[in-house]
Regions:
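Extracellular Ser/Thr-rich, low-complexity/disordered mucin-like segments
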Residues: 248-275
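Bacterial N-terminal signal peptides that target proteins for export
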Residues: 1-10, 269
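Glycine-centered small-residue hotspots that permit tight backbone geometry or close packing
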Residues: 123, 265-266, 282-283
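Solvent-exposed adhesion/ligand-recognition segments of exported proteins
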Residues: 23-255
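N-terminal zymogen propeptides
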Residues: 14-15, 24-28, 266, 278
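Actinobacteria-biased recognition of intrinsically disordered, low-complexity terminal regions
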Residues: 1-2, 293-298
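Bacterial N-terminal signal peptides
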Residues: 9-20
Length: 298
């Protein structure tokens, strides 16, 4: 066939080259839309309980529960909203963000693996059941990271989530199907969204991120929770702001809403790659048909 249709060889080679250089992140995840929940560092559904000198940098919200205890000795630097319209809206927006994260197309199945010792690039990582972090998880590269966890998330003592090579905590999301427990002295990053509860053991810190328990309790013990600061810029495009930490006057300003796309890098992205492939394949088919007819006529 190729002796009759030698013109196909460079077409096939060129098409393969296009596919080879297509950026993997052209189809990457988008940030879940936190909406007004972006204004909160901590949210819970039933109760918020604290022991020790915990510090929540920013706003604290609770809805529909009404029990917030342990402040003082704990400190909330922003505003505490308990079962009011602001907390209700933030919880509704959290539900939307949680669903967005849960429905993101999976890029890697990590079921049964420990996150410790892994070096991951932007993507959507799925655990069918529980997930554990023992040691250090390294997130490398600017973009969106979503962890879909079917049941529980547990970190061991002294576990670390670190970001390098442009990775930002504002682009990291943990969607947990039941409850999350951060072990003592854990250094965690990202927005932690648990369907049920979040427990932070003594000395565990979220050094850049949020703790958001949709339906259950947030339990603290001498912890620090600090939201991402500055403008969240993912890839070469701009993401939404991280929102203010709030103050005596009310919650901070919501950053730009909507999912934040991770733009493709390199030549074309999907917007140019797919039409180019269609043109090449279509042209090859037409030329093949024309030459076949010419051979038949001879």
């Amino acid at each position: 066939m190729f002796r009759r249709l030698p013109f196909l060889i460079p077409i096939v080679v060129f098409t393969g080259a296009l596919v080879a250089v297509a950026p993997l992140d052209a189809f990457a995840a988008t940030s879940p839309n936190l909406g007004t929940a972006l204004n909160f560092t901590a949210l819970a559904g039933s109760t918020v309980t604290n022991t020790g000198p915990s510090v929540i940098t920013g706003n604290l919200g609770l809805d529909p529960g009404s029990s917030v205890t342990g402040f003082p000795p704990g400190t909330v630097t922003g505003v505490t909203h308990i079962s009011d319209a602001v907390a209700l809206q933030a919880k509704n927006d959290l539900t939307t963000a949680y669903t967005d994260a849960a429905n993101a197309p999976v890029t890697t199945d990590m079921t049964g693996l420990d996150l410790g010792g892994k070096n991951l690039t932007p993507g959507v990582y799925k655990f069918d059941s529980s997930a554990q972090l023992t040691g250090t998880l390294t997130l490398s590269g600017n973009g969106v990271y979503i962890f879909q966890i079917g049941s529980t998330l547990t970190t061991a003592s002294n576990a670390v989530v670190q970001t390098i090579n442009g990775a930002q905590a504002c682009g990291v999301y943990w969607q947990v199907g039941s409850s999350a427990t951060l072990g003592s002295a854990t250094h965690f990053q990202g927005t932690l969204m648990a369907l049920t509860s979040i427990t932070m053991i003594t000395g565990a810190n979220i050094i850049s991120g949020r703790a958001m328990a949709r339906n259950g309790a947030l339990t603290l013990a001498s912890n620090h929770i600090v939201p991402p600061v500055g403008t969240c810029t993912l890839g070469s495009g701009g993401g939404g702001g991280n929102g203010g930490s709030g103050g005596a006057g009310g919650p901070g300003t919501v950053g730009t809403s909507g999912p934040v796309p991770v733009p493709a890098t390199g030549a074309g992205g999907p917007g140019l790659l797919v039409p180019a492939l269609m043109l090449i394949i279509g042209g090859a088919s037409i030329e093949a048909a024309r030459r076949s007819r010419a051979v038949a006529v001879r």
